């Protein structure tokens, strides 16, 4: 039997989800855990040529956090030496479809880097993990029957909130700062944004799509488009950029239906009031007309919501203040610290 060290020790096996690791672990919890005596480190698995000997030497006795994905050889090593490690937590922000696995049954191994392979590796990570940590209630419900211990960890507020002096200016910015994964969602609003910008000369639209901007969005009046940036650069941008209105469309057939409400925190950090799709994760978070607006998929509802925020600026300013109060309430980083502090033990959960 492996003799575990008495000093709590976390190792994050980092694959390709640095932003996920930072949001849900490093930024809200690392400094405090280290101050309390817990050893915390990030092992970037793709930067090193895999060596079972090195891996065992580095990982033995540690609590492990795996975010989203991990390479096949690393998973095999953990499977073969599971008794040498402490608690394993698997942090999930995306569930690969079981249909991908079913389609591969009885066929040759899935192609490296393909979605079927990702689905297969995810199932193996579920089997390894003592606890699966999910970022949204949608994922919590979807995984309830797939793992005996599923815990919800909603996103924390990772930066300071601004003053709202920019809302006193005459020119307002309407922002959408989703990644290319949200391309289809914002495309739905192309005619809405063209219409609004045609009728309002005191607003601009900002999209973070750069060279990948779809043609359907390119003729929006007073459009500002910027290239997508790294996770770290985006955090810096959010701390400096000020918007009045943020868009968070999540349409019925969106590929992002398992998303957390991180977009609410991003919009609020930039000083904006959000317009959100009236479905999870926003429908139980936003108080319609108080700290944001909830709308359906009909473009007419998005047009009406934009007109409301642009037309009644005093009410919009009040919503922005309320959104900041809610962000402090639901995004308290101490909640995330307490979550990981309670798990900083080598004792396995099952």
Residue ranges and their predicted role:
Residues 82-102:
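Active-site proximal beta-strand in glycosyltransferases
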Residues 10-37, 155-163, 168-240:
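Conserved catalytic-core segment of nucleotide-activated headgroup transferases in glycan assembly
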Residues 286-289, 293-300, 308-314:
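Conserved acidic donor-binding segment of nucleotide-sugar-dependent glycosyltransferases
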Residues 127-162:
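Donor nucleotide-sugar binding/catalytic pocket of nucleotide-sugar-dependent glycosyltransferases
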Residues 184, 232-269, 275-284:
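Nucleotide-sugar-dependent
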Residues 96, 111-131:
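Membrane-proximal helix-turn-helix segments that form the acceptor-binding/catalytic region
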Residues 1-67:
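N-terminal pre-catalytic "stem/leader" segment of glycosyltransferase-like enzymes
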Residues 20, 297, 311-344:
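A charged, aromatic-enriched C-terminal amphipathic alpha-helix characteristic of glycosyltransferases
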